[in-house]
């Protein structure tokens, strides 16, 4: 297997603190770049844990179609602005941020007061605009999760009628693009590939960390396949063969042999397969001639029994 290397050839941080990193991975065998790129992209876009605003509460508001006196934006606009906030919570529990701003003022994300567990990535993002003589009291809920979580209206907490739920987007990676460079050539002229992958995040995670977390997830996914062992089903006995299910009557034994076997509770070939030649001789009134007759009848259908118990 080829030993490849990973180089970060570009890293940018935008004004809103979003980050973009470009990585070059290679050399790879033909076809491996596509395999690697698709796997990385799928996990990067939907498999990493992130933080998001999941609900807000505005003083004096109990539904999303309301307006707030003295605030330029309506409640739907405020909901959308809060949904787009980039946050990073290090807590597994619900975190709540609060603000009370008196106008005239432009309410920014940096006005939210969270515990030390939550970082607001872009503090300059505008939430609302408050006019002179008015104020805005806002509560923002932040949680951690994976992927996309729509509001479940059926299970919504109806006891908190003023808590406005938000469809949560927990994905810290916003965009992944990759392409394949096939210009690398190995000794002997065989083609090699390099994967160029561009990762853009919301700033709550660096592209380097996103790539590392993705690689670890894929390792955990594939590692068990390297030590696959077949587990036999416990308590499941194999079904008897068709020959074993043949009734004793169809062996065409003599009357003497047949009657002796019946008295010994032998009703089918399956029962006979538990006997050795010595066991047959121990059946009452069952001599060697009858035993030989049974052996021959079994051999005609392709079944043999051991000579003695020790050879069974």
Swiss-Prot record:
GO terms for cellular component: cytoplasm; DNA-directed RNA polymerase complex. One of its GO terms (molecular function) is DNA binding. Residues 1-229 are annotated as: Alpha N-terminal domain (alpha-NTD). One of its GO terms (biological process) is DNA-templated transcription. Keywords: DNA-directed RNA polymerase, Nucleotidyltransferase, Transcription, Transferase. Residues 246-312 are annotated as: Alpha C-terminal domain (alpha-CTD). It is an enzyme of class 2 (transferase). It holds the Pfam family RNA_pol_A_CTD. Its EC number is 2.7.7.6. It catalyses: RNA(n) + a ribonucleoside 5'-triphosphate = RNA(n+1) + diphosphate. DNA-dependent RNA polymerase catalyzes the transcription of DNA into RNA using the four ribonucleoside triphosphates as substrates. Belongs to the RNA polymerase alpha chain family. The N-terminal domain is essential for RNAP assembly and basal transcription, whereas the C-terminal domain is involved in interaction with transcriptional regulators and with upstream promoter elements. HAMAP family: RNApol_bact_RpoA. In cyanobacteria the RNAP catalytic core is composed of 2 alpha, 1 beta, 1 beta', 1 gamma and 1 omega subunit. When a sigma factor is associated with the core the holoenzyme is formed, which can initiate transcription. This is DNA-directed RNA polymerase subunit alpha. It comes from Synechococcus sp. (strain CC9902).
